[in-house]
Design a protein with these regions (language model features):
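Terminal export/targeting leaders at protein ends
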Residues: 1-35, 130-131, 138, 149, ...
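Short beta-strand segments
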Residues: 8-9, 123-125
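Short flexible coil/turn linkers enriched for glycine and charged/polar residues
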Residues: 42, 115-117, 139
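Short, low-complexity, glycine-enriched hydrophobic/amphipathic alpha-helices that associate
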Residues: 55-101
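Membrane-engaging insertion elements
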Residues: 86-124
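Conserved, surface-exposed functional patches that form binding/active-site neighborhoods
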Residues: 111, 126, 132-135
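Terminal membrane-proximal soluble interaction domains of membrane-associated proteins
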Residues: 124, 137-151
Length: 207
């Protein structure tokens, strides 16, 4: 079974070390790592630090194709930032992410766990026995989330739909705000014109 292993490191150098060790020895008698990427959360965005692709086939190579890239894209996009609390202005949105993502989803877990300045390694792997990669990474100060790769693919599809809904709502709110702003400006101009007319009338009556 293909798995997505997400490891969040408190110390950046440990993240680099973990990725390097897997890159140097991606296939053992305990596990096989096909792809991995190291990202860092900075200024509420995600930057890719390093990555590798061994070319080793997974049990579902079609599924594996853009899986890690898709997950990174979601985590660094509006949904990931909203779940991680980076889009404070939208947290009161009427759009309920709970309708789109399960509370136990990897997207929600990782978005909530990774803090600004921390690094995260995401790996696509197969294990001969459960917990083999966790055991290897346990020497680091790390928090690990494991998910079935097929389930992650489904989560990504749901998150993409949620992003589209969020974008539609944001556009609608922006248009409404622009209409309200225009209405206020028109009303302000009317008041200014009326004040000017009253001023002229007052001068005429005085003369």
């Amino acid at each position: 079974m293909d798995k997505i292993i997400t490891a969040i490191f408190k110390v950046e150098s440990e993240g680099y070390q973990a990725l390097t060790e897997l890159k140097q020895n991606p296939e053992t008698d305990k596990y096989v790592v096909s792809q991995a990427v190291l990202i860092k959360k900075e200024n509420n965005g995600l930057n890719t630090l390093d990555s590798f692709d061994t070319g080793i086939e997974t049990s579902n190579d079609t599924l594996a194709g853009g899986l890690i890239g898709g997950l990174v894209g979601i985590l660094g996009g509006p949904i990931g930032m909203l779940l991680g609390g980076s889009l404070g202005a939208l947290t009161g949105s009427v759009f309920d992410l709970g309708d789109a993502l399960d509370n136990e989803s990897i997207i929600e877990k990782v978005s909530d766990m990774i803090m600004d300045g921390e690094v995260c390694m995401i790996a696509l792997a197969q294990e001969k026995e459960p917990g083999q990669l966790q055991q290897k990474l346990s020497k680091f100060n790390v928090s690990i989330v494991e998910s079935n790769a097929a389930e992650v693919e489904e989560e990504i599809e749901q998150a993409i739909k949620a992003e589209k809904e969020l974008e539609k709502e944001a556009r609608a709110k922006l248009r409404e705000a622009q209409k309200e702003d225009l209405k206020n400006k028109v009303e302000e101009k009317k008041q200014q014109l009326q004040a000017g007319i009253e001023e002229v009338k007052a001068k005429v009556n005085k003369d």
